[in-house]
Amino acid sequence: MIRRHLLVVLALWAAPGAAIAQDKGQVNVICSVQADWCGMIQTVFTRSTGIRVNLSMRGSGEALAQLTAERANPKTDLWFGGTGDPHLQAAEQDLTLEYRSPALGQLHVWAQQQAAQSRYRTVGIYSGPLGFGYNTELIARKKLPVPKRWADLLDPAYKGEIQVANPASSGTAYTMSATLGQLMGEEKAFEYLKALHKNISQYTRSGTGPIKAVARGETALSISFVHDGPTEAAQGFPVATITPDEGTGAEIGSMSIVKGARNLDNARRLYEWALTAQAQQFGAAARQFQLPSNKATPVDPRVPDFKRIRLIDYDYAKYGSAAERRRLIARWEKDVGALPR
């Protein structure tokens, strides 16, 4: 199915009779979206420009750790995707390069604000809300209610039935912790997380791991970005999603050029390409259903309808701070991660 989508997209991208471009060097990319989307970017960009894309797959937290470790000798040129908070933290730590794209005016306001907030060291490429994923067949078979609120997840009926990622490695889970802190206040949020721990079967490394486990029937529920639900449903899995009534946060998936990039010109070329409406269609073609940042990009009907979701006024500046991230993760590891299983 993905191969068929790729062939269609290639046909749309290439001019009639166009030949594959000649070799024009390379660009080294950390990719923090799902593998099918990363692979499509790699194939289409290489075929259309002649620039080889060398991919490294990392979750957002892992990507930030890699860039920090490589600060003195960067091996990465561009970081594509993943939650925006770590991109802001990379900008604050001078790991990424200031670059003002001439395409900024074509983007939604939230994508432009992400760029301005980082002093133009990152930019929004998509957005997606946080919520719950569930296996419809497993929920029915176990006679479990569908949760509608954050508070519902504390129901003892869900003991061992929920998966969520670890905020130290996953931007999804960090967004969850930050969202709860803003909804409840930090002290109540950590009391909530400690109570929720009793119902968690596993803390995964990757933010998409829990909803994939839901799809496979390994767990009934996940805390996930809700745009990941249609990805699994499109493959025939019995997955549905819901956003909590109390309110929820949303990520601004971002893209950054690494300071000290060895292939800077090619990184800028990929950056500009990724902001075009045409390139942003590859997300839906790869069955990834975030809201694209380019206003001219056609929106797939499976993309969550933000107008129907109660979104909090997420403080991207505060939770995009490197010090705040370190503090919150350290507290989570001490107060929640260290609890007995």
Language-model segment annotations:
Residues 32-39, 75-218:
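Extracytoplasmic ligand-binding site segments that recognize negatively charged/polar headgroups
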Residues 128, 192-197, 201-204, 235-259, ...:
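Periplasmic-binding protein-like
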Residues 314-341:
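Conserved C-terminal helix/tail region of periplasmic/extracytoplasmic solute-binding proteins
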Residues 258-316:
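Mature extracytoplasmic/periplasmic domains
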Residues 22-89:
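Early extracytoplasmic/lumenal segment of secretory-pathway proteins
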Residues 133-138, 178, 251-263, 282-283:
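A bilobed periplasmic-binding-protein/Venus flytrap-type ligand-binding module shared by bacterial periplasmic
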Residues 97-105, 122-123, 151, 237-249, ...:
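Short beta-strand->loop
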Residues 85-89, 215, 220-238:
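A ligand-binding cleft/hinge motif common to bilobed small-molecule-binding domains
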